[in-house]
From Swiss-Prot:
Co-factor remark: Binds 1 Fe(2+) ion per subunit.
Class of the enzyme per the UniProt entry, highest EC level: oxidoreductase
Keywords noted in UniProt: Dioxygenase, Iron, Metal-binding, Oxidoreductase, Vitamin C
UniProt GO molecular function: 2-oxoglutarate-dependent dioxygenase activity; iron ion binding; L-ascorbic acid binding
Protein name: PKHD-type hydroxylase Xfasm12_1709
GO terms for biological process, alphabetical: DNA damage response; intracellular iron ion homeostasis
Record InterPro entries: Oxoglu/Fe-dep_dioxygenase_dom, PKHD_C, PKHD_hydroxylase, Pro_4_hyd_alph, Pro_4_hyd_alph_FE2OG_OXY
PROSITE patterns, per the entry: FE2OG_OXY
Taxonomic lineage from the root: Bacteria, Pseudomonadati, Pseudomonadota, Gammaproteobacteria, Lysobacterales
Cofactor or coenzyme needed: Fe(2+); L-ascorbate
Binding site residues for Fe cation: 96, 98, 163
Coiled coil: none
PANTHER family for this protein: PKHD-TYPE HYDROXYLASE YBIX (PTHR41536:SF1)
SMART domains in the cross-refs: P4Hc
């Protein structure tokens, strides 16, 4: 399921992040990928140990927690802390697939933890007219989809998808990216639950008979109970 979620960040929040990132120290993005990815990845990335990465990451996680649509679409169990990248002129990232299992930050009790990447997320931090090129291109069974969204908007898509970032030919593209392990492993099941949840919300807003809404809500939770992994 490819889904555009508008205004995760307000204009003020996105601008503030841009300003703080402008003064940051960036590193070669190839340092965070394996040999295959390094052959096609040409961008800059905020270091994992950067205090700014942690600060902005917390702000993004707080914003995501305030979005009912994000929660309904992802049903998050675990989230990798947001990372940040920058594409300048001639930067690009060729077709690649995200790793299936990723390490989470070490817990206070030093217990190792990992995340299964079910959903890939890109949060755009500057507007499309500030750069040329730089489209996120996602390939699926229906072809290739070009994504280039306003600052503060989020795109989510299955981590099983091949995807790339087109070459930037003018300006600079700044974004945050992260992965989610969902309570519901299968993308088709998540899509069905989102459609059902959306229908329930619409019927509730239109003052439909309470018993009808209750029956649909019962179906939703029983499906979630059957499909979820905790």
């Amino acid at each position: 399921m490819l889904l555009h979620i508008p205004t995760i960040l307000s204009r003020t929040q996105a601008t503030s992040m841009q300003e703080r990132l402008a003064a940051a120290n960036w590193t070669d993005g190839r340092e965070t990928v394996g040999p295959q990815g390094a052959q096609v990845k040409h961008n800059l990335q905020l270091p994992e140990t950067s205090p700014l990465r942690q600060e902005l990451g917390h702000e993004i996680l707080d914003a995501l927690a305030r979005s009912p649509l994000y929660f309904a679409a992802t049903l998050p169990l675990r989230t990798l802390p947001p990372r940040f990248n920058r594409y300048q002129e001639n930067h690009q990232y060729g077709f690649h697939v995200d790793g299936a299992v990723m390490s989470l930050p070490v817990a206070p009790d030093h217990t190792p933890a990992s995340l299964r990447s079910d959903i890939s997320c890109t949060l755009f931090l500057n507007d499309p007219d500030e750069y040329e090129g730089g489209e996120l291109i996602i390939a699926d069974t229906y072809g290739e989809h070009e994504i280039k969204l306003p600052a503060g908007d989020l795109i989510i898509y299955p981590s099983t998808s091949l995807h790339r970032v087109a070459p930037v030919t003018r300006g600079m593209r700044i974004a945050s990216f992260f992965w989610v392990q969902s309570l519901v492993r299968q993308a088709t099941h998540r899509h069905q639950l989102l459609e059902l949840d959306t229908a329930i919300q619409s019927l509730t807003a239109s003052n439909t008979d309470h018993n009808t809404i209750l029956r649909l809500t019962n179906i939703y939770h029983n499906l979630l109970r059957e499909w979820s992994e905790t």
